[in-house]
Amino acid sequence: MNPVFVYPQSRFESAALIDLRSGEERARLSPSALQGFFNIVQRWQLKNDEARELLGSVSSSTYCEIKKNPTNTLDVDRITRVSYLIGIYKALHVLYGDPLADQWVKMPNTNMLFSGHSPLELMTQGGIVAMQQVKTLLDSSRSGL
């Protein structure tokens, strides 16, 4: 016999899942995602090459096109990357004050995850998986783990 788990009913409605396979959903989310991304690029004082790597090694011409026309629809990979970066940015600003929160990504870090490298180096080299690891680390710090 399998145990049955009963959870109390929440008074909050669960958020609807967003289907990123849908072009309409990506078109709806992309402008605000890109606005957030370029704000982060500015706050973190990233070079174009670093920003391009965070978006998934896009070419210079593609990056310039995205920058000129931030209403372009992002593909699933890029919108996922931007989502992680926004989460990282938010977590940093919860954990630290403004100057440190924006400098943290470029600072060498002794945490085992970074091995003395900066979080930015890890994320540009490790892509989405590294972004997920950085976000998980920061979320754990926020919750006191």
Where are these regions (language model features)?
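Non-transmembrane "mature" sequence context
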Residues: 1-145
